[in-house]
Amino acid sequence: MRRTPVAAVPLAASLLLAGLAAPQAAWSAPQAAWNTPRTAWTSWNAPRASWNAPRAERQEAFRAAAARYGVPEKVLLAVSYLESRWDAHQGLPSVTAGYGPMHLTDPRRALRLTGPHDALHPTGPRRTSHRAGPRRVSHRAGRGTAEEAARLTGISADRLVRDPGANILGGAALLARHQRDLGLPMSPRPADWSGAVARYSGATGAGDARHFAGEVFSLLRTGAGRITDDGRQVWLSPSPEIAPHMEHVDRMGLREGGNRNTDCPANLACEWLPAPYRELPGGGYGNHDLSDRPREHRIEYIVIHDTEETYGKTLRLVDDPTYVSWHYTIRSSDGHIAQHVRTRDIAWHSGNWYVNAKAIGIEHEGFLAKAGAWYTEAMYRSSARLVRYLARRYGIPLDRAHILGHDNVPGTVPGSVAGMHVDPGPYWDWGHYFALMGSPFKATGGAHAGLVTIRTDYARHRPRYTGCEEPGEDCRPHGSASVRLHTAPGHGKPLVRDVGRRSGGRSTYGVHDHGARATTGQQYALAGRKGDWTAIWYLGQRAWFHNPHDAPTAVNAGGLIVTPRPGRASVPVYGRAYPEPEAYPKGVPVQPIVPLQYMIPRGQRYAVGLATHGEYYHSTTYDETAHRLVRGRTLYYQVQLGHRVAFVKADDVDILPSSV
């Protein structure tokens, strides 16, 4: 019988084992946080020591542009926040060819800058590599708003995309033109600009237009404030009394869609674009599996991906019965959502069948590393609302043990580890994303709590990466959610090794190499402190990251940890939590329980994310009546092993409170 320290039993039982039977209990805390109206102000509340006397020129630029074109200043600020969070992005285009704080689009310029995105992926061919040809930059409704803004302002398109102040003037001019085109007065009241705001989104469907306008007015009510990526301080004071005039949007004559067949919240614009489910020659089928979740088995995870393709091509790929699949795609330009696979069914998206069987996959239009491929606020907000809704509906806790990046999903066996995908990568802003879901990452313990939660100041934290444009070349400085991990305190010390990523385990600064990285929201067991450096247990090593007191990159946390049982020199870890052989019924092949190439040595501690009994969903035929769910008695703990999660058998470890 496995020995568990007496002191750990009540805590472990209440927080983990009981959660197997009562998943909704884990939801209560995040859900309460969603109702806090100041969630949009998270960046404003960041440590002020890191602001370095921010300048107010951008605030003045909004004020001047609003006055010049007769647009309410708050409307201009709110629209810009939805487009870019007021950032300039170093004059680089978004994935939808938008530039600057107002996201003025110039597709031809963006295509000249970015070119085709067909460079060889460092970890092997991308999933779309079998479809040759250059990718086109996506943009709204085929028009470039920078050219329109140039005609309205007399400012060159080149300056409009490069100069943030000019860019804001261009956005104000476009809003004013939309207001006039709708036959509406140049009113000082924000509500009277609902139609112009909706038209600014470029949406061609009524649902998308209403959603964008609704998000802008939601922001007007809550307010926001932050320091931009180039050090400018911007503030939008809250106006809780403001409500949009949606009848202005209704009179725009846009196409009505509807989310009648989708699993989406009512206030999101979703459409049903089904992925095919059909038999293929030779006895195969594609491109997903039918199931009956959660009635038959629970949904435990939501996996966040980026597409590495434009929205249009992504839709063509998911329509291919010989290809892979995912549940949702979110468009960058306006946050529009397409659902392809019903949540009760199993999509083929994570590269790990165990995770697929228990997960919902969401693709976001974007490119992990290409210069300027930043994600719009509209996309972040749509995704956050969708994930919040799905988490509540299916009892999924809002934490990084359950909301995974594709780059957090483990390989199933040693041979699959190196080829696992690495999206959404270090430029996905996990802190902002979780704040939008009402579950910001906070300190949950004191100095002796025993765990740390990674939490970078995204805009200010700009570690070195290479390989965004050319192999080995430094990437442009950019905000990042990840910290770098070294073998000893000091920026010049070697990076920790990841024996699964490449031969010899050597880690690099490559933007696609997460072998020596930890990312915002992930929790690790504390392994030491020395000056401005903090150590964690990571892939069987003590790993150090820079965590200075005046600009912290992590906060203290409490929870549960596992450590090898006494007498064990090390314990194996697994990429899937499969049942014991005795659990399989006749006719279902026994799946081997194969350890990964990693292990947890004696004396090391790893943060626990969840507990689960072994499970395998057998689905190898088009006929769903032959599908079988196998449940075992073996108990596993999911741990934060490295950048990816992994599983350990409960019989191999002791589970303890994390406090030290």
Predicted stretch roles:
Residues M1-S28:
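Secretory targeting and sorting signals
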Residues S14, P54-R55, R232-G351, Q541, ...:
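N-terminal catalytic cores of peptidoglycan-degrading enzymes
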Residues S50-N52, A61-Y69, T153-G165, G183-S187, ...:
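Second-shell loop/turn segments in exported
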Residues R55-T222:
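Catalytic glycan-binding domains that act on GlcNAc-containing polysaccharides
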Residues V75-A78, P101-H103, E300-D306, S325-I330, ...:
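Structural recognition of the beta-strand scaffold that forms the well-ordered cores
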Residues F212-P274, G372-G479:
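Basic/polar, cationic surfaces and motifs that engage anionic cell-wall
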Residues H514-P548, M599-L656:
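SH3/SH3-like beta-barrel superfamily modules
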Residues P548-Q591:
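Intrinsically disordered, low-complexity linker and terminal regions at domain boundaries
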